[in-house]
Design a protein with these regions (language model features):
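Extended, charge-rich alpha-helical interface modules
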Residues: 1-128
């Protein structure tokens, strides 16, 4: 199946797959991650799209924060520890997801992409 998506979504997916390639140890899972990463890389090449490394790295850094926050959140939830740290993980997750949205928006604008993600709420989260 082929679906047209915003370029920011493709950058996001590639960043997440690259994080998985660095962190997943299971060879069977890695096979699928590599396969998906290769498909997306070829798709960008076929479209003549070069990845803006600065925007990509910014998005990857945010996705790494989300990954780490989500891991802490899941660990706390598994232990049924719904304490202050659990709440902080939830707040950070919302904050980082909004930062991620803003970077994807900049990517879409940079590439003049007509498909653009929209949030249903008016204000972005501020965990400060």
């Amino acid at each position: 199946m082929k679906v047209e998506v915003a370029i920011g979504e493709i950058f996001d997916k590639i960043a997440i797959l690259d994080i998985k390639l660095a962190r997943i140890q299971d060879s069977e899972r890695l096979k699928y991650v590599r396969g998906e990463r290769d498909v997306l890389g070829v798709a960008l090449q076929n479209e003549g799209i070069d990845i803006d490394l600065e925007l990509y790295e910014e998005l990857k850094d945010i996705n790494t924060k989300i990954w780490d926050t989500e891991a802490g959140f899941r660990d706390k939830e598994a232990k049924k520890e719904f304490d202050e740290e659990f709440v902080e993980f939830a707040r950070l997750n919302a904050k980082y997801n909004d930062e991620r949205f803003l970077v994807k928006k900049r990517i879409n604008e940079h590439y003049e992409c007509e498909i653009r993600e929209q949030k249903s709420y008016d204000r972005l989260y501020n965990a400060d």
